Design a protein with these regions (language model features):
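Non-heme di-metal
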Residues: 1-89
């Protein structure tokens, strides 16, 4: 049972870390998008647009990771409930 509790704690910590990273990706996306609008050449504009797109991809990947971690967290919590239920019986 203790190993399940430790896994739950680890997953919760991972979720918090990833949730902290998402706003940074959003901010970076906005930064590069703004830079692309101020760019003075097509080459630099395209570079900044590419970087902005990459930051948006990072944001989406992180959101997907959070959803996967939340599913895993629910599975672990369900396992913990089952273990507790079996101990009572």
């Amino acid at each position: 049972m203790e190993d399940v509790r430790e896994k739950i704690k680890a997953i919760e910590e991972m979720i918090q870390v990833v949730l902290l990273a998402i706003p940074r990706e959003i901010s970076a996306h906005a930064y590069y998008l703004n830079a692309s609008q101020r760019a003075t050449s097509d080459m630099s504009r395209n570079l900044f647009l590419s970087l902005a797109e990459q930051e948006k991809d990072h944001e989406m990947k992180l959101k997907h990771i959070v959803e996967e971690l939340k599913r895993e967290l629910q599975n672990c919590k369900g396992s913990l409930r089952e273990i507790k239920k079996q101990k009572v019986q």
